[in-house]
Amino acid sequence: MDFSTNGSEESELYHAQIHLYKHIYNFVSSMALKSAVELGIADAIHNHGKPMTLPELASSLKLHPSKVNILYRFLRLLTHNGFFAKTTVKSNGEEEETAYVLTPSSKLLVSGKSTCLSSVVKGALHPISLDLWGVSKKWFHEDKEQTLFECATGENYWDFLNKDSDYLSIFQDAMAADSRLFKLAIQENKHVFEGLESLVDVAGGTGGVAKLIHEAFPHIKCTVFDQPQVVGNLTGNENLNFVSGDMFKSVPSADAVLLKWVLHDWNDELSLKILKKSKEAISHKGKDGKVIIIDISIDDNSDDHGLTELQLEYDVVMLTMFLGKERTKKEWEKLIYDAGFSRYKITPICGFKSLIEVYP
């Protein structure tokens, strides 16, 4: 198109340029956020107990004086993006001075809080998560069924995870942090768990979600089912135990099977196997058993552009890391019915996820 012919086309060119450049440099906002987490900016403001001026913040973070203006410019971007907010305070000379406070988003970065998601930031923006994109062109042209992660590192994600103790710790912390937010979903959807006497949390990690369910419903006997290297050394109690095994071979019997952040790691063929094994695990309950899926359900018709963008970004992450996928309602329906289930119900939870109840 010749953009130089009239003002309308010039305007279109300028808007297209802004759109392009914005997406090119989106990574700067992400990395500035990572820097804020690593520096502990949210912790410093929280611990200060009141709005914090730039000199106070720089002093608390023990920054070199030459970096104060750099901190200001990072904060300017992060404030624009909604992670911090500005207010004014009176200094000793009674002059007003700019100070920073937390916003709902940065409150999610305060260490020690049950809602802290700092480990998610560290995991998602870890060098290993970013460096793999350097071989994306090679990955597209190779005639191999492998993930972008495998193309970049020569091994699959899970093998890498189990060999790198530092990264494994970040991953487990991130999963635990995400699970703690699940407490809100439990409170809002108690009916999902009422009437159950037993539940198995498949690929339940160190048991964060199972513990939340057990706290809310002490009568439910919860089993955390995961790989030996994950649960082998964990100790449970009368109503919370840990079992190791392979979910592609069998799942422990229970009234309900929980699959939280599991099926999006796998393609349809392997997800179908997991669902069929889960169906076998609840077979003793007849029509009263259920499988509870916590995952994303993409709404193609959503008016919330930001929400859909986040869900589609998650889909590409699952693709490049695991050859997994985030699914639309229609894709969930096909997968569920192909596994032999008769009905399902989808309930949006936690902002961008869904709770899917699946019945035999």
Swiss-Prot record:
Q: What Pfam families has UniProt attached to this entry?
A: Dimerisation, Methyltransf_2
UniProt superkingdom:
Eukaryota
* Assigned keywords, A-Z: Methyltransferase, S-adenosyl-L-methionine, Transferase
The record's InterPro entries line, in alphabetical order, gives: COMT-like (IPR016461), O_MeTrfase_dom (IPR001077), Plant_O-MeTrfase_dimerisation (IPR012967), SAM-dependent_MTases_sf (IPR029063), WH-like_DNA-bd_sf (IPR036388), WH_DNA-bd_sf (IPR036390)
| Upregulating conditions | Up-regulated by copper.
Query: According to the UniProt entry, what is the EC number of this protein?
Result: 2.1.1.270
Write out the similarity annotation: Belongs to the class I-like SAM-binding methyltransferase superfamily. Cation-independent O-methyltransferase family. COMT subfamily.
Its protein name is (+)-6a-hydroxymaackiain 3-O-methyltransferase 2
What is the species listed in this Swiss-Prot or TrEMBL entry? Answer: Pisum sativum (Garden pea)
